[in-house]
């Protein structure tokens, strides 16, 4: 595939997404269409559009644009979101010496989005709440640093409590240019509004006053990371760890195979797994998530984003992102559940590199978290260790799919591919596999790559 055909393929995919009301772009395009109709009818001497024309713009979507002033403001959001989509075209590496497309960036985005009302634009579902900035400030004690429970590339996450006693997590976009913040907000909003599964975080509303905020339901337990590596670690019995592993795997199967379009999360880690009151895991933070069209085997990205310790080799070597990127990160998460160790310790020691020799020797007693003592199910421990070993394989081709991971965790070890599946997988031997096969990859190079990425991240 040359760069021109890749470019054309992405343009075709964009057009298809515009026609699909169940995709983020389809929903946003429908809203923008209605906004344009409303704007044109209010500023023209021509007769207003008939009811049928307006209904067509709303057909098969939950999007509604009711207020002209709000529509005008959100129109700026949509244009920035669309521009960001076009920027992704440049992620295809040019071949045959072709020059990459030049995308001009508008640096004059209007950052003043105060007073915009969510329900004037969207009516995703009846339970979606439109929070005011005062609601959010009261809930988080004016964004007190003590209430920070997570940090990301563009945002901080605060825990809060509403007047009725409901706990919430507030993701507040604080970093980047106004354009970048807007793009990140719309990208994540476009995904989470279409995600609904017991093992994904419950999105309950937004606040677009005084900045951009996404609000999620939170339980007193907080995140897996805070329990696993914090003072409340004793609460995580083996049975709970095993159920967290299985529930998180179910959530990833939903994202990869159960959604209308494949979703690659790209930032699976202990801090991004919320736990409900009964210790059920919920995947959260879709800020880095990508929709992967069915025509494509992978995305190529030029900007490294995510969390050190969870990067798959093909990602930080070649910028390749697909379902197996999440599988690798899930393997690291399994190791955290087994060992109680973080993905990177205080000395920057990689959990993967520490655990691999023990996995190869099947030294499970040396792997298991000492705080558990002998209070674990040996059969389940063997399942988790063997599955983790497969998930963190250097070769993305040799890693299982998440649906296979679930079967392995359940003890269905006779997971085999049909001849057709095997043939498809042989045909899909890409790019990530061929590039990894072309170099000898070892622990020293792994650490060297991590160091280089760390230097780039700190310098940017």
Curated annotation (Swiss-Prot):
Gene3D superfamilies the UniProt entry points to: Phosphorylase Kinase, domain 1, Transferase(Phosphotransferase) domain 1
Binding positions (ATP): 149-157, 171
GO molecular function: ATP binding; GTPase binding; protein serine kinase activity; protein serine/threonine kinase activity
Residue ranges crossing the lipid bilayer per the database entry: none
Domain Protein kinase: 143-415
Pfam families to which the protein is assigned, alphabetical: PK_Tyr_Ser-Thr (PF07714)
Major localization listed first in the record, in broad terms: cytoplasm
Active-site residues per Swiss-Prot or TrEMBL entry: 267 (proton acceptor)
Localization (cell): Cytoplasm
Stretch forming the signal peptide: none
Cellular-component GO terms for this entry: cytoplasm; nucleus
Keywords: ATP-binding, Cytoplasm, Kinase, Nucleotide-binding, Phosphoprotein, Serine/threonine-protein kinase, Transferase
Residue positions, PTM Phosphotyrosine: 315
Biased composition (Basic and acidic residues): 7-23
Residue span of region Disordered: 1-67
Reaction(s) catalysed (UniProt annotation): L-seryl-[protein] + ATP = O-phospho-L-seryl-[protein] + ADP + H(+); L-threonyl-[protein] + ATP = O-phospho-L-threonyl-[protein] + ADP + H(+)
The enzyme's E.C. designation: 2.7.11.1
EC class (word): transferase
Phosphothreonine modifications at: 307
Similarity section: Belongs to the protein kinase superfamily. Ser/Thr protein kinase family.
Subunit structure, as described in the record: Interacts with ARAC5 and ARAC10.
Name assigned to this protein: Receptor-like cytosolic serine/threonine-protein kinase RBK2
Gene: RBK2
């Amino acid at each position: 595939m040359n760069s021109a055909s890749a470019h054309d393929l992405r343009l075709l995919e964009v057009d298809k997404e515009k026609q699909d009301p169940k995709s983020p772009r389809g929903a946003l395009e429908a809203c923008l269409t209605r906004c344009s109709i409303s704007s044109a009818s209010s500023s023209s001497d021509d007769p207003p559009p008939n009811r049928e024309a307006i209904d067509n713009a709303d057909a098969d979507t939950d999007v509604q644009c009711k207020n002209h002033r709000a529509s005008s403001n959100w129109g700026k959001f949509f244009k920035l979101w669309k521009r960001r989509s076009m920027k992704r075209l440049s992620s295809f590496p040019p071949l045959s010496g072709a020059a990459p497309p030049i995308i001009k960036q508008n640096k004059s985005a209007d950052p003043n989005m105060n007073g915009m009302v969510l329900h004037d634009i969207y009516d995703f579902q009846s339970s979606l709440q439109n929070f005011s900035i005062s609601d959010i400030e009261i809930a988080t004690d004016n964004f007190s640093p003590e209430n920070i429970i997570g940090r990301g590339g563009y945002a901080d996450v605060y825990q809060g409590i509403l007047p009725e006693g409901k706990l919430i997590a507030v993701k507040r976009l604080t970093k980047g240019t106004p354009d970048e913040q807007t793009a990140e907000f719309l990208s994540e909003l476009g995904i989470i509004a279409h995600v609904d599964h017991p093992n994904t975080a419950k999105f309950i509303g937004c606040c677009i006053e005084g900045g951009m905020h996404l609000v999620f339901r939170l339980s007193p337990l907080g995140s897996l990371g805070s329990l696993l590596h914090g003072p409340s670690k004793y609460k995580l019995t083996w049975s709970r760890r095993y159920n967290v592993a299985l529930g998180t795997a179910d959530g990833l199967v939903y994202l990869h195979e159960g959604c209308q379009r494949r979703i690659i999360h790209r930032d699976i880690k202990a801090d991004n797994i919320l736990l409900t009151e009964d210790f059920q895991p919920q995947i959260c933070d879709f800020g880095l998530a990508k929709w992967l069209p069915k025509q494509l085997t992978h995305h190529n990205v030029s900007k490294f984003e995510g969390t050190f310790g969870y990067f798959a080799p093909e990602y930080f070597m070649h910028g390749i992102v697909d379902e197996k990127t999440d599988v690798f990160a899930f393997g690291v998460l399994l190791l955290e559940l087994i060992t109680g160790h973080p993905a990177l310790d205080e000395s920057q020691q990689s959990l993967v590199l520490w655990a691999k020799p023990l996995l190869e020797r099947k030294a499970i007693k040396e792997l298991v978290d000492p705080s558990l003592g002998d209070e674990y199910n040996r059969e389940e421990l063997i399942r988790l260790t063997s599955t983790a070993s497969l998930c963190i394989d250097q070769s993305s081709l040799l890693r299982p799919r998440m649906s296979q991971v679930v079967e392995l965790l359940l003890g269905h070890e006779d997971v085999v591919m049909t001849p057709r599946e095997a043939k498809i997988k042989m045909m899909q031997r890409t790019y990530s596999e061929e590039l990894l096969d072309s170099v000898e990859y070892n622990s020293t190079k792994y650490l060297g790559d991590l160091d280089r990425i760390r230097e780039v991240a700190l310098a940017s």
